[in-house]
């Protein structure tokens, strides 16, 4: 997955989802790297090529069937993922970030788009239609394009039926599912996860049941209950868009 916000939550929950569904999986993320159930600390969102390929080799030897990975714009630009063949590429959203490195938003967008330009023909390019750059990302890809949206007609859709501090009731495509996650941005993350599971051939009912058991990724809108029923929210938000999403949710 690539995008400004939502990468860590999406890959972490995909890893947990497919583990729950009975698959042996790997995870390469901002928070941690996992080979099956064996975890190690991560240094960068997208590690250097030697580290990535070493971990992928460990995953193969451990019998992992899937690896869910965050792909940063810097990682793409520096060719840290060169030579890797992705089965699925997901685009979450694009807002201002890393402009200290890329200098311009156009260059930031170009690096994100390059990830999809390089996907093979037998891959899937999953994109958020509600982001103004969603279709730009996949306009030159050779992969099969699959869309998701909370606002318009798409291959996979979602609507928030109810929400509170305890979670949300979502209508995912034509079926309802409860989740302990909160906030519209998490509805987008869960829809991207659901869409990915569907293109990878997972059973829809089993997927929705498993999604309802998934807790937030560490430091991603975690709701902690304090004394006297006081709620404490822990969140990593460090971009204007991410902070706005958190404050709107609260």
Task: Report the location of each language-model feature.
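Phosphate-binding loop of NTP-binding sites
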Residues: 1-129, 133-142, 173, 197
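Short, conserved glycine- and acidic-residue-centered signature motifs
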Residues: 45-48, 186, 239
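Charged catalytic carboxylate motif
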Residues: 51, 192, 242
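Hydrophobic side chains in well-ordered alpha-helices
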Residues: 55, 207, 243-246
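Acidic, Mg2+-coordinating active-site environments of NTP-dependent enzymes
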Residues: 62, 86-232
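Glycine-rich, charged/polar anion/phosphate-binding loops
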Residues: 74-77, 157, 244-247
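Conserved phosphate/oxyanion-binding catalytic-loop motifs
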Residues: 235
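AMP-binding/adenylate-forming catalytic core of the ANL superfamily
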Residues: 238-250
């Amino acid at each position: 997955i690539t995008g400004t916000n939502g990468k860590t939550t999406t890959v972490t929950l995909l890893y947990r989802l497919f583990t729950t569904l009975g698959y042996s999986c790997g995870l390469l993320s901002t928070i941690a790297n996992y080979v099956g159930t064996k975890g190690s600390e991560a240094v960068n969102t997208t590690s250097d090529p030697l580290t990535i390929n070493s971990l992928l080799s460990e995953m193969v030897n451990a019998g992992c069937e899937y690896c869910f990975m965050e792909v940063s714009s810097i990682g793409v630009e520096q060719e840290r993922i060169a030579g890797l063949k992705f089965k699925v590429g997901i685009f979450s959203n694009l807002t201002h970030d890393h402009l200290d490195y890329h200098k311009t938003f156009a260059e930031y967008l170009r690096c994100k788009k390059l990830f999809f330009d390089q996907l093979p023909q037998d891959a899937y390019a999953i994109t958020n239609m509600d982001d103004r750059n969603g279709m730009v990302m996949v306009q030159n890809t050779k992969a099969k394009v699959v869309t998701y949206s909370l606002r318009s007609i798409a291959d996979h859709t979602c609507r928030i039926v109810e929400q509170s501090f305890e979670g949300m009731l979502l209508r995912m495509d034509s079926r309802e599912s409860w989740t302990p996650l909160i906030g519209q941005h998490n509805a987008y993350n869960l829809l991207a996860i659901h869409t990915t599971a569907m293109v990878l051939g997972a059973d829809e009912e089993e997927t929705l049941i498993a999604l309802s058991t998934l807790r937030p990724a560490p430091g991603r809108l975690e709701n902690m209950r304090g004394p006297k029923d006081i709620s404490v929210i822990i969140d990593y938000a460090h971009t204007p868009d991410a902070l706005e999403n958190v404050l709107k949710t609260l």
